Amino acid sequence: MTLKDIPFWRVLLIFQTARVYAGFGDPREAITMIHQQHGKPCDCAGGYVNAAPTVYLAAVSCSSHTAYQPSDSLKWRCVSNPTLANGENIGNCPCKTFKESVHSSCYTAYQECFFGNKTYYTAILASNRAPTIGTSNVPTVLGNTHNLLSAGCTGNVGQPICWNPKAPVHISDGGGPQDKAREIAVQKRLEEIHKSLFPELRYHPLALPKARGKEKIDAQTFNLLTATYSLLNKSNPNLANECWLCLPSGNPIPLAIPSNDSFLGSNLSCPIIPPLLVQPLEFMNLINASCFYSPFQNNSFDVDVGLVEFANCSTTLNISHSLCAPNSSVFVCGNNKAYTYLPSNWTGTCVLATLLPDIDIVPGDAPVPVPAIDHYLHRARRAVQFIPLLVGLGITTAVSTGTAGLGYSITQYTKLSRQLISDVQAISSTIQDLQDQVDSLAEVVLQNRRGLDLLTAEQGGICLALQEKCCFYANKSGIVRDKIKRLQEDLEKRRKEIIDNPFWTGLHGLLPYLLPLLGPLFCLLLLITFGPLIFNKIITFVKQQIDAIQAKPIQVHYHRLEQEDNGGVYLRVS
């Protein structure tokens, strides 16, 4: 049978047939919706809580806090890490026994103390917690050397507890001071290796960002934005037609997605950077996750990078030598720290990942809160809906099927990852400089009583400040540098028109503040003017009704009873 022999209506029916998924819709769209609504781990969409959840699926360190994904919710909940209390040294330790490690969820603040010429940590115990084996609070089978031992805390609640400042190998205190000390030790060791390999000491942007003027954007930041937009334009041109690319202020935490690159680079030309904090995503959804494991030798030369607690390692490769990540990838290890190089004496568990910048997208047709006359009318501003970069690129629907499922060439993602590895710290300083300008402008805003949300500089606008993010406008031609400047000019034009209008400048500039009160005042005036008249009308009407009821005669209807004389005999007694 040929195509000509098939009736036309059958061919039309075949092309009109839609794909169904057992009546539940496309599961990839559900994954995209979950990421868009619940955000990234460090966004803390589930809010901050006082204690870590009893059972959680994954934990991600976010510098000042730790994000947990509980089993009863898809939103990440965050717990602030303990801080060093005021008066960091209290002298002699108030304890007679000292523990090896104490989990950070068991106290809120800690101090240093001394005992026997040694330094220890001490805190007031707030709760008890049993130590666990595994990647979460759910214990796994003992004997698995790849599992992470999470420290516990036992004692009398409300009493002081003391412990060593250095934790044993492969034991985590949940982002507390012991984990911080481990990270500092690893960073110092990598810096020593870097100095031995490069005696002339070439400063990496991660270690020393370039100096630049406060009013100018750094070249690395602009190049990263351009590369991100180019990738977005090729993978999702409809979204990239007109949009805002928003970078968070402060220290950026790049996104880490699984990488299937099995080729490891040569150690001779391996770039060495300090540990980089990242946000691992999609590792829990990955079916076949390959991990690298190096056992510890139980000596002082071990470089403990920790064990991953955000991935299900289905395959574990035992490593006994140094490792160099491919040019566009990193090793993500314990406390979600990323490394490009692992020395020969490293110990822990790591996964290979590709980095993407922590950029959110605002569609061009979405209203952004640019201040204008709305400020004077005191209109409530609508919240800006940000689209995560992974959703915009379509990565959330493809990672679970492997890199072959990515819509665009994987080489483009690796190029962006390679550039991000080199420039992330320079970008951090740039956005921090811009945030400093926003903070300094806040005082001007309060003094001039104007809602100035646009970031201004001597040479023109840089970015639009939206919810602690620095947003850059882009269209078909790429990143538009003068977009904010044009918005500022339009805004200034509107303000001049308002200032020149005597209606707004009356009463020595107090009229804009009196306008919100005009409505209630007008209603009150109407009530005072017409209120008594309406009240008298109501009283008169009620009185008339009562008088009418009282004046109306009461009619009683009755019938006269009939009398019958039967002519009976009566006995009369005298």
From Swiss-Prot:
SS bonds (residue pairs): 243-246, 243-471, 463-470
Cytoplasmic topological domain residue ranges: 536-574
Signal peptide: 1-22
Membrane-spanning residues: 515-535
Glycan attachment residues as annotated in the record: 117, 233, 260, 267, 288, 298, 312, 318, 327, 345, 475
Domain remark in the UniProt entry: The YXXL motif is involved in determining the exact site of viral release at the surface of infected mononuclear cells and promotes endocytosis. The 17 amino acids long immunosuppressive region is present in many retroviral envelope proteins. Synthetic peptides derived from this relatively conserved sequence inhibit immune function in vitro and in vivo.
Extracellular side: 23-514
Sites annotated Cleavage: 382-383, 556-557
Quaternary assembly: The mature envelope protein (Env) consists of a trimer of SU-TM heterodimers attached by a labile interchain disulfide bond.
CDD domains: HTLV-1-like_HR1-HR2 (cd09851)
Name under which the protein is recorded: Envelope glycoprotein
Post-translational modifications reported in the UniProt record: Specific enzymatic cleavages in vivo yield mature proteins. Envelope glycoproteins are synthesized as an inactive precursor that is N-glycosylated and processed likely by host cell furin or by a furin-like protease in the Golgi to yield the mature SU and TM proteins. The cleavage site between SU and TM requires the minimal sequence [KR]-X-[KR]-R. The R-peptide is released from the C-terminus of the cytoplasmic tail of the TM protein upon particle formation as a result of proteolytic cleavage by the viral protease. Cleavage of this peptide is required for TM to become fusogenic.
GO cellular component: host cell plasma membrane; membrane; viral envelope; virion membrane
Motif annotated as YXXL motif, chain positions: 558-561
Region (Fusion peptide): 386-406
Location of the motif CXXC: 243-246
Gene name, Swiss-Prot/TrEMBL: env
Origin species: Simian retrovirus SRV-2
